[in-house]
Amino acid sequence: MDRGGIILSLDAKEFISKFETFCPLWLAEEGDPCGLHLGTLDKKIERVMMTLDVRPEVVKEAIDKNIDLIIAKHPPIFRPVSRLTADDPQTKMYIDLLKHDIAVYAAHTNMDIIWDGLNDWFCEMLGVNVDNYLVKTHEISFKKLAVYVPIEDSRKMRQALADTGAGMQGNYRNTSYSLVGTGRFTPNAQANPAIGRSDQEEKVQEARIEVVFPETIQEKVLQAMFAVHPYEEPAYDILPLDNPGESFGLGRIGHLDTAVDIEDFVQKVKTTFQLDGLRLVQPKKAKQKVQNIAICGGSAGKFYPEAIKSCADVYITGDVNYHTAHDMQS
């Protein structure tokens, strides 16, 4: 099975940093072990494999194809491992991965929750226009960073901040504002200035760069700012914002352009996801025409009350247990 090997050449940390800008770890639900599971990111990578689960056959394929990094939907290690032995198929996978220097990174519920993530892809495949999330999980407040930097360093600073995920506002990325002015300072005898001399006033043409960022990445934003700023003591402000925050949630609520027969929609789901069969749980008074759709990947049967509240005609999920199915029919 071809699991979508990608050939590239770049630093693994840089690759994951860019990935987490799109799909941040702070969106993962509590207790969900997302992130790096095995190996190291202190290396160059050329081949990346995407997979749903890390299983022995996946590991063998990764070894055969000289894969450097596996990005998995489901974390391979959910519980602490007490011993690593080759006679256990599960732990032998870990041994083989480490032996062949294959890193494993998991993006689980954060990939389910992020806008333009997995549930949005499902909706796009089925022709569902997304209106909202199904179950709210996060409400994120924003802050603003204003940093003063010599004009010749402003482009480098804007890029470094954008790489952390700062400047993301709705459907727009890399947003910032710059204002040019004059910075004044006098280094003392103990200073080691990048510009100017001790005990002499210095004037520098500087840009004030402003970016908005979610409060969850403040430390990352500041680390990036300090890393590229040429000054020994950068001047900057962090401002709290009273603007409405951004909400995130599991699942999606949406609608089809036109209502369709339930049988036709079921067939479309089977065809789209290449299913041999699926389970249809249908109340006696269910609508025969459907248009409002709720969807949540994975085992999300417990969220069917939210689907009902959203006035969905159909709720699609990966797994529904026996008793929940009976509740749905009642």
Predicted feature descriptions by range:
Residues 2-330:
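Hydrophobic structural segments
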